[in-house]
Amino acid sequence: MIIALGLVAGIVLGFITYRVILQQVPIRLMTMAEQRLLTMRNNASNIFFHGRAPTAKARQIVMPSPDLVYSSCVYDLAKGPLRMQGNLPPAGHYWSLSLYAHNTDNYFVLNDRELSDRRFDVTLHPPSSRVAENQTAVKSPSVTGIALIRMIQRREDDLAMIQASQQSTTCQPAQA
């Protein structure tokens, strides 16, 4: 009887540990990241904010690569789908869009090698929507999350080209 009770207690403790560590910790970390980014942006969601090359003192992304320039958007699909679009830097310059769910899962990635016309146009749909997913229609597993664009800056004079790409990038409600 004591062995059975110990076994049940071990299973219950294991389940609680699983729930806390593998499910709740990522959600809490993403909530903190979203709140930090929103606080820096006057609580504005669904807008891309563009950075420069990170420095040791000025960085918004955790452990950023020093040769990448980031644009980020805390998205909220509570009011419906969002359309993200813009121009990429010229061919030969790395660009990627990564979408992260509220539990930190990276559920979608698009990069410059997949976009021969150097333009991206992605509609992000809420979890409750019924949509055929492809390169331009993506269903988010959560209502909130983070969209992250990365562009490589090899030389100082690449920054003007990167900023032109950033200025063309938008995130706005999708038209029905």
PLM regions with names:
Residues 1-176:
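A compositional/structural signature for long, glycine/proline-rich flexible linkers
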